[in-house]
């Protein structure tokens, strides 16, 4: 199976399956001399880790990362990157493959089962194999390294909508994001979602979500025209995440409903004595114009579909083409967008770090 590598200069290759012995990634292109240990990566994996509450899958994975290569202790006793490929690995410890006996014989509508069979003629049905969101743990690990390459950039993801119930922007509180299991900046919405997601879980169903991600501290100039646009790469990165069906940069589709003057981001001269660049009065563009960052926050919204693996019976066909029904047992997220939030952050970090290195290679700064 090909197409397991992401990035141009900073290249991440992930490997492994949901119910295999381990998952891992190789991150190539990381500059040398960056202090890096497992403790720099683990907190981000802990944020994504399954089984922490009833609103996510009950699969219990400690997700303890090991750095296998690409680092060495310097003379100061600090472990640093060497510039060679960084290999990361996480062991799988809580697989229950017997839960997927029905999936071996029938396709889950909305899942990758049929598409994988149609393309390859063979698939690992245990937990979805390579198509499982288990793979995204390695994106989060690689994203943690990418953040160290761009230390002046702050990346924040949060859930803005679950099952059609959106946050109230007037109640936005960034401090609330880490205080509830939904990455929600609106405490009232988080309370409502407790009931909403729990009801879906008990009914054997699932819900979709919208995740927003904001990167602050991105300087003007990252990105490139035409075929290496920053927003183009962001869109592709987010669409590569399991269950993602839509991405908006800045105002996205709302921009199509505005007039030219409404959609403009008016510019004002920089404050006297400042070298911070012009001041913008709005950010409809999401911090990117012409495929290149403007110095404003880079923003995107990511739409996650409802989890396809549900206990509710759904009409389908078996591998012989006969009509049947399927109920997916196993352990699955009632709303995959919740744990998708750290993954969105990680992909933002990987894209931005890659473009920083591209910019430095071409422009020398």
UniProtKB/Swiss-Prot annotation:
EC number: 4.2.3.5
Name under which the protein is recorded: Chorismate synthase
Gene name per UniProt: aroC
Residues given in the record as NADP(+) binding sites: 48
Tree of life domain: Bacteria
Binding site for FMN: 130-132, 242-243, 290, 305-309, 331
Subunit structure: Homotetramer.
Biological or metabolic pathway of the protein: Metabolic intermediate biosynthesis; chorismate biosynthesis; chorismate from D-erythrose 4-phosphate and phosphoenolpyruvate: step 7/7
Coiled-coil ranges (or none): none
Organism: Erythrobacter litoralis (strain HTCC2594)
Annotated function: This reaction introduces a second double bond into the aromatic ring system.
GO terms under biological process: amino acid biosynthetic process; aromatic amino acid family biosynthetic process; chorismate biosynthetic process
InterPro entries: Chorismate_synth, Chorismate_synth_AroC_sf, Chorismate_synthase_CS
Pfam families per record: Chorismate_synt
């Amino acid at each position: 199976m090909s197409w397991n590598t992401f990035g141009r200069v900073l290249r991440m290759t992930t490997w492994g399956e949901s119910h295999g012995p381990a998952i891992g990634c190789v991150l190539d292109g990381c500059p040398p001399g960056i202090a890096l240990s497992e403790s720099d990566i683990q907190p981000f994996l802990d944020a994504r880790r399954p089984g922490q509450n009833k609103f996510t899958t009950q699969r219990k994975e400690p997700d303890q990362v090991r750095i296998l290569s690409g680092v060495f202790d310097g003379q100061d006793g600090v472990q640093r990157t060497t510039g060679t490929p960084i290999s990361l690995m996480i062991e799988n410890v809580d697989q229950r493959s017997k839960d997927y006996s029905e999936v071996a014989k029938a396709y889950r509508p909305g899942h990758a089962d049929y598409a994988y069979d149609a393309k390859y003629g063979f698939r690992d049905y245990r937990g979805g194999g390579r198509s499982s969101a288990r793979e995204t743990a390695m994106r989060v690990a690689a994203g943690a390294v990418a953040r160290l390459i761009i230390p002046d950039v702050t990346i924040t993801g949060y859930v803005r909508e679950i099952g059609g119930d959106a946050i109230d922007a007037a109640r936005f509180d960034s401090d609330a994001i880490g205080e509830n299991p939904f990455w929600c900046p609106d405490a009232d919405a988080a309370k409502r979602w407790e009931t909403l997601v729990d009801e879906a879980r008990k009914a054997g169903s699932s819900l979709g979500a919208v995740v927003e991600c904001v990167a602050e501290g991105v300087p003007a100039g990252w990105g490139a025209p035409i075929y290496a646009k920053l927003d183009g790469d962001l869109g592709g990165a987010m669409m590569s995440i399991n269950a993602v069906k839509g991405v908006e940069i800045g105002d996205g589709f709302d921009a199509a409903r505005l007039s030219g003057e409404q959609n403009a981001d008016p510019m004002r001269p920089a404050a006297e004595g400042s070298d911070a660049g012009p001041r913008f009065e709005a950010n409809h563009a999401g911090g990117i114009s012409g495929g290149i960052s403007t110095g404003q926050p880079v923003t995107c919204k990511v739409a996650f579909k409802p989890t396809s693996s549900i206990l509710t019976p759904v009409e389908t066909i078996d591998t012989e083409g006969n009509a049947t029904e399927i109920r997916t047992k196993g352990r699955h997220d009632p709303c995959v967008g919740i744990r998708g939030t750290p993954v969105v952050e990680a992909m933002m970090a990987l894209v931005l770090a890659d473009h920083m290195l591209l910019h430095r290679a071409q422009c020398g700064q």
